[in-house]
């Protein structure tokens, strides 16, 4: 890359003004996120994938914007950093332990808090406050799964969480966000609508099948999976989720006619093979 133009958002401070609310179920969380689209620059919710019935998908919604501080006098102290000192057994994160954690996490969050100041890094990357957090998943690790679906397919989010709960596939981290339009790139992931990101411990026998079912659900709704996190998507789903895949293959054939540029993801999804034919 010889030259790149990057569009930046000008800010006058390193703080974010944050409002936090707890909601009893997924419907209430999503309704609040839609209602606040015009009032908040950033909106993210933690949702509880372990609950069923009337409290399915209960969540903690945090919304905010950059603090306007042209004088630069406001200083937000950095949060103290915790650390996971050892790698626990893989079985530690199971349905029972994650349900207990989710209950505590939900209760500790404020029911309604307005105007709290958060350090910008802590707001955007809360897991960075816990060093070696990945050790919590034990030696078997975890699988990341993230989808984006159009506004009109918001019910896919509820159906995905229902499947996870019904199949007893636990998610230690489930994050729901609103997306604006994607860019003009043929493989752009965002689309105006919703994105759900999950961290799932490796272990449950049903996990591969459930994720395949969620992939199908997303594809049928006109959505897509985030390839930067993917490690197991079936190749047949790629052109359904990324209908402009052909444009990428055409460009790759021009700039890399001998197929020198390769990756494990490209090999698994057949991108490399298609581009060299």
Model regions: which residues?
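Noncatalytic alpha-helical scaffold of FAD-dependent oxidoreductases
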Residues: 1-277
